[in-house]
């Protein structure tokens, strides 16, 4: 037989009010088990959907918003034990973390696939141009592929001092990391890099930041 909390005995009206605020379909343990199964099934469907390239942060955020009421209910429901409440919370949090890890890894895979596509474009261009010179794949973008032949130069690794200057500028302008013409001229003058190389480096840096970004809603529920 389940014990009735002393607080409920001393405050029956408050106890009734608390129960009435809980949806009727959440009031017994069998319903809790059904809800737990729904949580697991929903996250599994989301996981496989993301594997099929249907992934974005908006879907994850929407999923979190849908399950936030369940977390609130589980914390307040007196018919659940502490262990059951912790179990339901852990399922949701660990599932969200799994989705975020998958999203991050898929971002890395997209970068690899992007590089492979660029290599294929270069090989195709090389076959059609006798005067083609090798370029640095890491800083090559689609803009360079459409440039004139005389703009292609043999690529070299950026010097550490050049990278440091670019990183410093990016850190100071992270909220709006897009170069004004005077900034572009300054960096080009002090690094001997071409304007195209600088723009390409910043484009890659922005892409890297975007992949690792986690929305505030997701951070809040995981903390």
Curated annotation (Swiss-Prot):
Subcellular location: Nucleus
DNA-binding region ranges: 151-213
GO cellular component, one term: nucleus
SUPFAM superfamilies: Homeodomain-like
Sorted UniProt keywords: DNA-binding, Homeobox, Nucleus, Repressor, Transcription, Transcription regulation
InterPro entries listed in its UniProt record: HD (IPR001356), Homeodomain-like_sf (IPR009057), KN_HD (IPR008422)
Repressor recorded as keyword: yes
Chief site of localization: nucleus
Gene3D superfamilies: Homeodomain-like
A molecular function (GO) term: DNA binding
One GO term of the biological process aspect: regulation of DNA-templated transcription
Function of the protein: Mating type proteins are sequence specific DNA-binding proteins that act as master switches in yeast differentiation by controlling gene expression in a cell type-specific fashion. Transcriptional corepressor that acts in conjunction with A1 to repress transcription of haploid-specific genes.
Miscellaneous section: There are three genetic loci for mating type genes in K.lactis. MAT is the expression locus that determines the mating type of the cell, whereas HML (containing HMLALPHA1, HMLALPHA2 and HMLALPHA3) and HMR (containing HMRA1 and HMRA2) represent silenced repositories of mating type information. The mating type is determined by the MAT locus, which contains either a copy of HML or of HMR. Diploid cells are usually heterozygous for the MAT locus.
Record's subunit section: Forms a heterodimer with A1.
Family classification: Belongs to the TALE/M-ATYP homeobox family.
Protein name: Mating-type protein ALPHA2
Species this chain originates from: Kluyveromyces lactis (strain ATCC 8585 / CBS 2359 / DSM 70799 / NBRC 1267 / NRRL Y-1140 / WM37) (Yeast)
